[in-house]
Amino acid sequence: MAHPSLTDLIAAERDTLATGPVAVVLVEDDVEIATTLRHHQQIGFDHVIALMPEEFTLPADVEQTVLRATYDVYGPQAMETAVNLVNDAVPGQWVFYCFNAEYLFFPFCETRNVKEMLAFHTEERRHAMLAYVIDLYADDLSQYPDAVSLDHAHLDRSGYYALARADLERGGEPKERQLDFFGGLRWRFEEHVPTARRKIDRIPLFRAKKGLRLREDHTFSDEEYNTYACPWHHNITAAICSFRTAKALKTNPGSRYDIHTFKWHNSAPFEWHSRQLLDLGLMEPGQWF
């Protein structure tokens, strides 16, 4: 169902959105829109919201099953504004957010759905989940100049690292159970990426509550939401497998002509399976065996 704006969608669908986990997809361009929306339906989100320009089209089957709203996706803080509006509308509900050509993976997602995972995560008294944005890229940029190919997607199997996250209010002391994570294309081609956008950590899954606010760096106003685990043991982490950085590097005139391939000696074909991500240490099951 299509709505003229996100506020109209929320007003019309508020009761519906309260019945199950919600995925919010911000559609920045016309690349892999349908596959992104279908993927998040298939892994178990009850409601998928597509925020997109009016001129973009969807296949009929997707158009009938997602909640579409016309939205200024290029406006300042477009994602933060949208997520905060949805947060205020569905207190207590789990919400996920991503961009088009991004795909959420979590441990055992081939045999367990997102509602099962979130139920377990809730039982562990967690209200948010850390994910790493894992860059995907086509192996042959001459054949796929926008760097996007589902059938020939590759990822970096190493080259990831973490640094302590400084608490500026405490003189730069490390924040408890918070780290800044780096790697992938934003690390290998960092000269083309603004410093503030080099992190690959995101808190894309969270439980909505009154007054909560998503910030521009993909962290929340409640610091506990930004932690990678509870104090007593490790928790589930997820991965967002994303073509977004590769697309940007091959679209931006400042980097387009400097990059002829994204492949290097640590590239590996992406298998589109959670087992590969677990084996590479790019997410973990915590206590969810």
Where are these regions (language model features)?
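Catalytic-site signature of metal-activated, phosphate-bearing donor transferases
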Residues: 4, 108-289
